[in-house]
Every structure is written in C-alpha cells, then in structure tokens.
Regions:
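Small/polar loops that bind or transfer phosphate-bearing groups
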Residues: 6-7, 55, 121, 142
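Amide-donor transfer/coupling interface in amidating biosynthetic enzymes
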Residues: 12-18, 48, 74-79, 84-167
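Flexible gly/pro-rich beta->alpha loop and the following alpha-helix that scaffold active-site loops
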Residues: 2-54
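Short amphipathic alpha-helical segments
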Residues: 34-37, 67-69, 114, 152
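Catalytic nucleophile loop
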Residues: 47-68
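Active-site metal-binding loops of divalent metal-dependent hydrolases
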Residues: 27-28, 60, 143
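Short catalytic/ligand-binding loop motif for oxyanion handling, primarily in non-cytosolic enzymes
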Residues: 31, 62-65, 110, 148
Length: 167
C-alpha cells in the first residue's frame, strides 16, 4: 500500500481524488484555546467524503466537530490507558475487549448524533467512534505509538480501505 503524507498547509492545493482512504493525525493544537473554525473549514470536505477516514486525537476531534460534537478540557492524560470496546466493529478485529493504548491529550469530544460510540476508558468517554453510514472513524488515543495493539488497529483500518477498493 502506498502512503503519502500531506502537511496541513498543503492540504488545500492537493488533489485528493487518487487516494483510497485518509488518516488525519494528531497535532499540538488545543481546540479549546484557539478559534477552531480555520481547522474545521480546512477539513469540511470530509462531510461529503465516502472513502474511509481514521481521525487520530486531533483528527478524531476535528471529525467530531464537523458533525456537531463539542470539545472540552479534561485532566491531562499522557500515558497508556485501558480502552474498553463497547460495540464490536471491524476496526477492533483481533483485539481483546480491553486493550492498552497510548494517550496524549487534555481535551475530549462528545459523541456526534450520527456516530456510534465504539470504545471508552476511565479517563475519556469517547475513545473511539464511527459514523453510522460511512467508514469514518475517530480514536482519541494514539495507535501509531501503542505497540502491537496499535499496529493491529492500523492494519484493520488498512484492510477496511482495501476492501473498499474492490467495490
């Protein structure tokens, strides 16, 4: 699978049509301390997007804000946290019902009305969510730095992207 990194500042002038799926990464931005509108506007294309999307941390929050979620401050969480799956989904295939993932945030979002809550933790109610009609996922934790379980989750998302190519 080919992967291309597109810096945020290059997003507006990048043709996204060749891509099969998207990962929107974390960012050192506190949405409660800035005007989030420029970021929401930069990602507004997601609202009409049917290809798979995985939002991680900041990406999770942006995905939620686009769909009406609210962002709020919380106790800082910068360690591994036990994540509990509360709704089965292909994103969690081959993972136990409770697994550890690395956290690095001090904000959280509510669950938008057109999303299902998939996972929670003691620190954060909305650890993972999925759009009810699309393969649009958000995870508050950081699978990319969470070892084997994180790798499995990213492999699962990649498999979801590849399954859509065949349709």
């Amino acid at each position: 699978i080919d992967v291309q990194i597109i810096p945020f500042l290059d997003l507006k002038q990048t043709d996204l049509s060749p891509f099969e799926g998207f990962v929107i990464s974390g960012a050192p931005i506190l949405l409660t301390e800035i005007d989030p509108e420029p970021y929401i506007n930069a990602f507004r294309w997601i609202l009409n997007e049917n290809r798979p999307i995985l939002g991680i941390c900041f990406g999770h929050q942006i995905l939620g804000l686009l769909h009406g979620a609210r962002v709020a401050r919380m106790k800082e969480d910068r360690d591994f946290q036990e994540i509990e799956v509360i709704k089965d989904d292909l994103l969690f295939e081959r993972l136990p019902d409770v697994f550890e993932m690395q956290e690095d945030h001090c904000e959280h979002i509510s669950v938008p009305k057109n999303f299902d809550l998939l996972a929670c933790s003691d620190a954060c109610i909305n650890e993972a969510m999925k759009h009810k009609d699309k393969l649009h996922y958000g995870v508050q934790f950081h699978p990319e730095v969470s070892g084997n379980y994180g790798n499995i989750l990213l492999e699962n998302f990649t498999a979801l992207v590849m399954s859509q190519q065949k349709k």
